[in-house]
Amino acid sequence: MLRQGIAAQKKSFATLAAEQLLPKKYGGRYTVTLIPGDGVGKEVTDSVVKIFENENIPIDWETIDISGLENTENVQRAVESLKRNKVGLKGIWHTPADQTGHGSLNVALRKQLDIFANVALFKSIPGVKTRLNNIDMVIIRENTEGEYSGLEHESVPGVVESLKIMTRAKSERIARFAFDFALKNNRKSVCAVHKANIMKLGDGLFRNTVNEIGANEYPELDVKNIIVDNASMQAVAKPHQFDVLVTPNLYGSILGNIGSALIGGPGLVPGANFGREYAVFEPGSRHVGLDIKGQNVANPTAMILSSTLMLRHLGLNAYADRISKATYDVISEGKSTTRDIGGSASTSEFTNAVIEKLAKL
């Protein structure tokens, strides 16, 4: 079903939602859940809202303003909103390492809505100086099990057991998602990241499942495997060898941070999360930015580009193309870039530069 009716452009992002599961328009407009999150979330989502208003994009926002520091019961407000609207744009909720009493709201949201696939796009951007150029890889991460299952307990004082859950059903689901993504986006290979040399049952199940799905259902694509520690080294040394990486939960988080460093930082990485019924778009590297909150210096590029992925998901491709081009043009010219990529512009100045560029397109 996912292969039907959706055309892909070469090396561009193609949605994987079935058309019948997309939200309905009311009065010619979509309603989208907006979750600013913590840290710089409000600043960068404000950039998107301003750009969308300037472009008269037919989207209304339902804002759910809660913090990751709040009780997990509050995540229900976001869940209920997303169930109504089916699509969301989200900042990152902060989960302190020493937090006790409740788990991550980010994880809770993904589990409750079964948003099982995280997609992060790592592509070199002209105008951003980095050690390596022409990087173009995708990390597809299973979002709902693995080390993030949240099953921990102290069996006796001083002894903690953390359970890693891996299932064939969810491994098959993320494998098919990755292969479908590769086909729709004219990618050539899918590489399973694992640690099956040590975790022979859990990661062995994941690796073998990806291999079987690829060999039996997607013979036109190359299927590869790599151990996660080697993948980390290869990503730093020779990232051009990678096309689409499919990973269990934890490995995708680690490799995603490596990928963001390769292309210039977390402020440049767009991302999306998909389930069967719902889609939530957020920066791909999931950095909160608490240290620069309220300073008007955050790079909104990742959030802006994530919003263009959302527009394509909704079939609003012309708006997405305009905003993407304007954003890339501003970065390429280098006159109004933020300090994380060598400039001195503020968040609002970068946003205004994108709007000015849009007026000239």
Curated annotation (Swiss-Prot):
Substrate binds at residues 110, 141, 229. Mg(2+) binds at residue 229. Its EC number is 1.1.1.41. Disulfide bonds: none annotated. One of its GO terms (molecular function) is isocitrate dehydrogenase (NAD+) activity. Its cofactor is Mg(2+); Mn(2+). Octamer of two non-identical subunits IDH1 and IDH2. This is Isocitrate dehydrogenase [NAD] subunit 1, mitochondrial. The gene is IDH1.
